[in-house]
Amino acid sequence: MPNLSRLLEAYAQRVSALSRLQTYIGTDAGRRVMDGLVRRGDGENLHAVIWYSDLRDSTALAAAMPRDLYLGALNQYFDSVAGAVIEHGGEVLKFIGDAVLAIFPIDYPQEPQPAACMTALAAVGDAFKRMSEINKQRRADGESELSFGVALHRGNITYGNVGTVRRLDFTVIGPAVNEASRIEGLCKSLRTPVLISKRFADSVATNLRSLGHHELAGVEEPQEIFALPKP
């Protein structure tokens, strides 16, 4: 019995440690750290939906609000966006200031309409629904509404462990990640909260609206950008 007790205690400690790790660095990254996959340069190639979202007018919000109110607003935004991603099975990789980088891995890239693409679209709808509910409460409290833009793209990425020998980080890198960020950067100028790449648009049955071709920094050819259907 003493041996069983020690085994159960060790298991409980591992579960607790894994839960804390996953809270800070994500579900998959936390599992990899617990499994000892922490060498710099470890990684794998994936095909995935890439989600990049950003809080609108965050600099003005930060300047206009006391620190505690601004942090509260940030957390409301993250609850809406990251909460929706996680609820729909995505992996939140980073909070970059007020931006969220996440992925929905695609197991079978050769499929014409991967399920992960429709799942990501559902997560977008959920995120805006959550934000709408939060904004109702913010209006009732006399606070300004929050808004955000999001881009959906798909492509090959490298998911790996990078950094220095004393500070490592799990992240995704590759041209597709940069392109997703550039697409999201068009949300404000195009006055459209959700922008979608052609590669993603070709992967879903939803009738998306073409917004024409647009230049993306670091990308040679103008890219066709799509938006959700008008309600």
Task: For every predicted segment, state its role.
Residues 103-115, 150-170, 187-190:
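Catalytic strand-loop-helix junctions within cyclic-nucleotide turnover domains
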Residues 50, 100, 148-154, 225:
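A structural signal for short, well-ordered beta-strand segments
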Residues 25, 29, 70, 77, ...:
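Helical mechanochemical/support elements of P-loop NTPase systems and associated helical scaffolds
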Residues 75-89, 106, 110-150, 175-186:
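Alpha-helical scaffold within the catalytic cores of cyclic-nucleotide enzymes
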